């Protein structure tokens, strides 16, 4: 395996892990709770999903995939309802599928090419790294807020022995 395939595989693995965790958190929260904000300066789970879709589309699908950037970032935070849990999850899954396809199909040239996103200069790899870490960061916020709203464990690793030591 060469470095580009390893980079792609590991990036997609992290995206899939975050998606799995978001699906678990979503299953615990009600339709009403999805749009509840902790306070006026914080985002609901619904807003975070819209924001993640916008960010991943901008950084991976548009930038790495060399498509037109049509993101309307402010709308991601201004929305207060109107989409159900099923609609939000469908939007997220479609975005993630497009992101994964874009990463899988990216050439070495695309991964190394410098580009401007939100006024920052990144290589294609930099765009993927940003999208993956940003997705993970907000996945943690979604998990925390779902646990706060429902007073339930999410059990991300139930049934797994996480005490196994690393081996070469």
Region spans (language model):
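Short acidic-aromatic linear motifs embedded in glycine-rich loops, typified by GG[WY][YF]DAGD(H)
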Residues: 9-10, 69-87
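Surface-exposed helix-capping loop/turn segments at secondary-structure junctions
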Residues: 28-35, 102-112, 147-153
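Short, contiguous alpha-helical
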Residues: 12-16, 23, 33-75, 117-168
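Hydrophobic alpha-helical core bundles mediating ligand binding, dimerization, or RNAP-core interactions
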Residues: 15, 19, 26, 92, ...
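Residues within well-ordered alpha-helical secondary structure of globular protein domains
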Residues: 28, 51-54, 94
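Acidic/histidine-rich alpha-helical segments that form the ligand environment
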Residues: 80-115, 125-135
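Extreme N-terminal tail/first-helix region
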Residues: 1-14
């Amino acid at each position: 395996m060469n470095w580009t395939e390893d980079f792609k595989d590991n990036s997609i693995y992290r995206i899939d892990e975050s998606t799995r965790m978001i699906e678990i958190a979503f299953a615990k929260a009600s339709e009403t709770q999805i749009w509840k904000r902790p306070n006026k300066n914080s985002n609901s789970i619904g807003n975070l999903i819209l924001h993640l879709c916008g960010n991943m589309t901008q950084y991976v699908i548009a930038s790495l995939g060399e498509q037109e950037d049509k993101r309307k970032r402010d709308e991601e935070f201004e929305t207060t309802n109107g989409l159900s849990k099923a609609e939000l999850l469908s939007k997220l899954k479609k975005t993630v599928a497009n992101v994964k396809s874009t990463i899988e199909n990216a050439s070495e040239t695309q991964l190394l090419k410098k580009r401007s996103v939100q006024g920052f200069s990144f290589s294609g790899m930099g765009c993927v790294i940003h999208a993956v870490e940003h997705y993970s960061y907000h996945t943690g916020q979604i998990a925390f807020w779902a646990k706060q709203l429902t007073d339930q464990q999410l059990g991300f690793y139930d049934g797994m022995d996480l005490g196994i030591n690393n081996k070469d």
